[in-house]
Each structure stands twice: as structure tokens, then as C-alpha cells.
């Protein structure tokens, strides 16, 4: 089986800022899988990408350049299944529980997109209050340290690493205090920030790149950034 693995060629098609891409890269790094990565411009998608990605989104995983997988959750599950060990708990109920909270994390990502696209202060703060209440719910579910359920890093941790990373950048131009009074979320965020795979999921210029992206949104967030002189 291991011999067969070495023959497989993994090529991940990505975008530099996409959080769904990050969870796929974290999975590849955690499982020590050799892969190549190609960043594309989503505003100017190459023709070959449109053929490979029926939904027009990243990430896309090309396996041996002939089979194409899309949607990050499916890519992560596949990579986990075809390599030794697992980033999921072995207990089936526990695994399903992790998957449910992964889905919850995807909902937080949608709220974050709504946050940075909000046109005015009122809608921005309303959406932020919703995000804060979602983290308050998560606070009651984090059952271990340093990761979601303890010492072992799981797929759910790969999902929340990119979520927390947004707030590292938001903190540079806002005082949202998203995690005030949420000590478990704070510890978890800190542990994920220090995890090598989470760090390697983005380029070193990610914060500056994200700020530039946000600045161009014509939103309340872009006003905040300009006010800070960034």
C-alpha cells in the first residue's frame, strides 16, 4: 500500500488567500504527503481550470493529473484515507461529532465573508456579534488542550486554523476583541497559530496580501484599513 502511495502524484490547485485551500494544505503537511501547488487568479481563471473545476472554486486536487477532486472537505477526507494513520478520531460517534463541528466552522467562514463585505458600521457590528456568538457556542465544545479534543491534532483543527488566522489580520486594524471571555478559544487559537502545518498553509506575505484584498472591497472594512493608514 505504501509503495502504491509513492506512485501517486498530488497536484493542488489553489488561491493564495482561500481558507478552504489552507485546510487542504494543512492536511497534506500533517500527513507528510509530497505534493505540488499551483496558485491561480480567481478573477482571471485559466481555461484548463474551468475544465477541471466544475464549480469554479478552489481547491482542486489532481491525482496523477488525470482524476480531479473538488471541494475541500472531500479532498481532506480522501487524503486522510489514503495515507497511514488518521486525522479523525477512531470512534465513529466522535468522528461524526468532529464532522458536525467542521460544518459549523464552514458557517463561520461564510459569516467572515459577510463581515468583510459589510457596507456600513451597523451591519459590520451586527455580523461581528453573530460571529462572536458562534465562538461562544464553540467555547462550550472545546474539550482539551492544546487542540479541540486534546493533545492530538485532528482535521477539525485544520479547519479552525485558517478561521482564527483571519482575526490575526483583523486585529491589526480593529479592536473587535472577538475572543474576550472565551479562554478555551484563545488557547486553541494560540496553539493553532504555533502549529507548523498551519503556518505553512500560507505565504509569508499573507497578512499584507489579505489587507490589500480587504482594502479593495469598497466596504466598511476597507474604510477601517484606510483610517489606520495601512
What kind of region is each of these model predictions?
Residues 23, 100, 104, 137, ...:
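Alpha-helical scaffold segments in carbohydrate-active enzymes
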Residues 150-174, 178-187, 192:
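GST superfamily/GST-like fold recognition
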Residues 80-84, 106, 143, 164, ...:
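Hydrophobic/aromatic-lined pockets within catalytic cores
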Residues 2-148, 217-221, 225-230:
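GST-like domain detector, emphasizing the conserved glutathione-binding G-site
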Residues 116, 142, 192-193, 202:
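Hydrophobic residues in alpha-helical segments
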Residues 64, 161, 204:
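Conserved residues at the C-terminal ends of beta-strands
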Residues 111, 166, 196-201, 205-230:
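Non-globular targeting/processing and membrane-anchoring segments
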Amino acid at each position: 500500500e505504501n509503495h502504491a502511495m509513492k506512485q501517486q502524484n498530488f497536484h493542488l490547485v489553489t488561491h493564495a488567500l482561500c481558507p478552504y485551500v489552507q485546510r487542504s494544505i494543512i492536511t497534506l503537511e500533517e500527513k507528510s504527503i509530497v505534493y505540488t501547488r499551483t496558485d491561480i487568479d480567481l478573477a482571471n481563471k485559466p481555461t484548463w481550470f474551468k475544465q477541471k473545476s466544475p464549480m469554479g472554486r478552489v481547491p482542486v486536487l489532481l491525482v496523477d493529473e488525470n482524476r480531479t477532486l473538488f471541494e475541500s472537505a472531500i479532498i481532506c477526507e480522501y487524503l486522510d484515507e489514503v495515507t497511514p494513520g488518521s486525522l479523525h478520531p477512531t470512534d465513529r460517534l466522535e468522528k461524526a461529532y468532529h464532522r458536525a463541528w467542521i460544518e459549523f466552522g464552514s458557517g463561520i467562514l461564510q459569516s467572515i465573508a459577510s463581515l468583510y463585505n459589510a457596507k456600513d458600521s451597523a451591519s459590520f457590528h451586527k455580523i461581528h456579534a453573530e460571529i462572536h456568538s458562534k465562538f461562544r457556542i464553540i467555547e462550550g465544545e472545546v474539550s482539551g488542550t492544546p487542540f479541540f479534543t486534546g493533545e492530538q491534532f485532528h482535521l477539525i483543527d485544520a479547519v479552525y486554523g485558517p478561521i482564527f488566522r483571519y482575526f490575526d489580520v483583523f486585529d491589526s486594524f480593529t479592536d473587535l476583541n472577538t475572543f474576550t471571555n472565551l479562554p478555551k478559544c484563545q488557547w486553541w487559537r494560540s496553539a493553532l497559530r504555533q502549529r507548523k502545518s498551519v503556518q505553512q498553509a500560507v505565504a509569508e506575505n499573507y497578512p499584507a496580501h489579505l489587507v490589500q484584498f480587504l482594502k479593495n472591497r469598497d466596504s466598511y472594512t476597507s474604510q477601517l484599513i484606510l483610517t489606520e493608514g495601512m
